[in-house]
From Swiss-Prot:
EC number(s) recorded for this UniProt protein: 4.1.1.49
GO biological processes: gluconeogenesis
Note on how the cofactor is bound: Binds 1 Mn(2+) ion per subunit.
Gene designation: pckA
Pfam family, one: PEPCK_ATP
Protein name per UniProt: Phosphoenolpyruvate carboxykinase (ATP)
Gene3D superfamilies per the UniProt record, alphabetical: 3.90.228.20, Phosphoenolpyruvate Carboxykinase, domain 1, Phosphoenolpyruvate Carboxykinase, domain 2
Swiss-Prot/TrEMBL catalytic activity: oxaloacetate + ATP = phosphoenolpyruvate + ADP + CO2
Record's subcellular location: Cytoplasm
Lineage of the organism: Bacteria, Pseudomonadati, Pseudomonadota, Alphaproteobacteria, Hyphomicrobiales
């Protein structure tokens, strides 16, 4: 076996059990990875210099194929209702077969950090079969200085072999595709899928497992910080505006997806962004668009013209989930440190396709925990096959697939931090107003931005509020620059009876979903549940 590149020779591939490899390319930077990816036919070059790769049949994550080793350590720690389990013996067979499959192959290795705060970072070593995967994860995680590589020792090892096909009977998994996590031995295996996002989310899953024990809150959120050091967190599921609304020219971007909250403040887990590109335009999102024209960016499943190599961001023939991965410094106002003080504001974003939630509401600590555990948004027809109308989605902690522990662990951590640091919390509806999908209209982005500006500059917290009779939280009675009736959802509907019926339906959905958490929360959190205080 030959090694090419800079690495700690005392802790080589054999530490991960890998042996009889043809070659390992260690910590190659973008030019070297471009050469390898293009020579191997893994990717194409787009106009401007981005590397474009396809992922085949897997154009998104495979959450049902993700498994955690159930052993003496994890038995009482992992939320098994939400995480598939395999035995240590099944993982041993899987790991041995992974090692055998890798023999004779060339692999790419990246030594990286997950976490911008040194005291709470994980050293993640990622072995990949594809050169473009190596560039992807190099873009997404935090890159050590070159002189750190000679003494780097990994805490976590990830091996990603898309050509490996699992045997469900032998390995205890569901299909040929699998993501297997051994938290005790700190090994993660990814096979049978070329979707690069699995690597990024594997690191996130590991951090979500280990950090709560250290009193650090891991979060699926974006974050930014103002000139006065006033930071803000934006929680939200896909399609709620998390990336768009945290991108503010007046505020520095910490990150767009994964953060931690420690006794020192908040910090990004990553060193890059993984932005959706479907229908991306230079006019609407100029900073993200500019990254697609830069050398070093990886574009995933984006259709490009075979002759001109121009990308067509409106083409969803492969998937709606087209993306680009780029280092954070590609964004002009990105924070150079990825760290900030304790947040002044927390924003929970929801896309309410039923059109009954107000555009903004102020939450108490108990209400914030309730809505964090609920993780509500709504899917709209067209986003998923077979979906005819709005469908409520509850993804606890705004990221259920990545949460190994019980949601109450994260919810209680968040609630304690909110109370300790006197954080203002807001629920923001970026969905529909004046009716649901089909009868109403999308909440104007200018309204949402105006409300967020007032929330983040502190003026909204001093406004007059009314108690929403359907959902119980506090809603401002007026905000400068926002039409008053928009703050009263029922006033935006022509059919008041239909509004009441729809609101009642959504309240009942919240109540039904939260039953699974009632035994794990205090009475004040249970009391924060929507209860319909008026007859409807």
């Amino acid at each position: 076996m030959s090694d090419i590149g800079v690495f700690n020779a005392a802790v080589g591939a054999d530490r991960a059990g890998l042996r009889n490899l043809k070659r390992v390319f260690w910590n190659l930077e973008a030019p070297g990875l471009y050469e390898q990816a293009l020579q191997r036919g893994e990717a194409q070059l787009a106009v401007g210099g981005a590397l474009v790769a396809e992922t085949g049949i897997h154009t998104g994550r495979s959450p049902k194929d993700k498994f955690v080793v159930r052993d003496a350590e994890t038995e009482a720690q992992v939320w098994w209702d939400n995480n598939g389990a395999i035995s240590p013996e099944q993982f041993d067979r899987l790991h041995a077969d992974f090692i055998a499959h890798a023999e004779g192959r060339e692999l790419f290795a990246q030594d990286l950090y997950g976490g911008a705060e040194p005291a709470h970072r994980v050293r993640a070593r990622v072995f990949t079969e594809f050169a473009w995967h190596s560039l992807f994860i190099r873009n997404l995680l935090i890159r050590p200085e070159r002189d750190e590589l000679a003494t780097y020792e990994p805490d976590l090892t990830i091996i990603d072999l898309p050509s490996f096909k699992a045997d469900p009977a032998r390995h205890g998994v569901r299909s040929e595709t699998m993501i297997a996590c051994d938290f005790t031995r700190r090994i993660m295996l990814i096979g049978g899928t070329s979707y690069a996002g699995e690597m990024k989310k594997s690191v996130f899953t590991y951090l979500n497992y280990i950090l709560p024990q250290a009193g650090v809150m891991p979060m699926h959120c974006s974050a930014n910080v103002g000139g006065a050091g006033d930071s803000a967190l934006f929680f939200g599921l896909s399609g709620t505006g998390k990336t768009t609304l945290s991108s503010d020219p007046a505020r520095a971007l910490l990150g767009d997806d994964e953060h931690g909250w420690s006794p020192k403040g908040i910090f990004n887990f990553e060193g890059g962004c993984y932005a959706k590109t479907i229908r991306l335009s230079r006019e609407a999102e100029p900073e993200i668009y500019a990254t697609t024209e830069r050398f070093g960016t990886v574009m995933e499943n984006v259709v490009i013209d075979p002759v001109t190599r121009l990308p067509d961001f409106d083409d969803a023939s492969r998937t709606e989930n087209t993306r680009c991965a780029y280092p954070l410094p590609f964004i002009p106002n990105a924070s150079p440190t990825g760290r900030a003080g304790h947040p002044k504001n927390i924003v929970m974003l929801t896309c309410d396709a039923f059109g009954v939630l107000p555009p903004i509401a102020k939450l108490t600590g108990a209400e914030a925990m309730y809505h964090f555990l609920s993780g509500y948004t709504a899917k709209v027809a067209g986003t998923e096959k077979g979906l005819k109308g709005p469908e409520a989605t509850f993804s606890t902690c705004f990221g259920a697939p990545f949460m190994p522990r019980h949601p109450s662990v994260y919810g209680n951590l968040l609630r304690d931090l909110i109370a300790r640091h006197h954080v203002d919390c807001w629920l923001v509806n970026t969905g529909w107003t004046g009716g649901g999908v089909g009868t109403g209209r999308r909440m104007p982005i200018r309204v949402t931005r105006r409300l967020l500006t007032a929330a983040l500059d502190g003026s909204l917290a001093k406004a007059d509020f009314r108690r929403d009779p359907y959902f119980g939280f506090a809603v401002p009675t007026s905000v400068p620059g926002v039409e008053p009736h928009i703050l009263y959802p029922v006033k935006t509907w022509q059919d008041k009876a239909a509004f009441a019926e729809t609101a009642k339906k959504l309240v009942e959905m919240f109540q039904a979903n939260f039953k699974r958490f009632e035994a794990h929360v205090d009475a004040d959190v249970r009391a924060a549940e929507p209860t319909m205080s008026i007859a409807a």
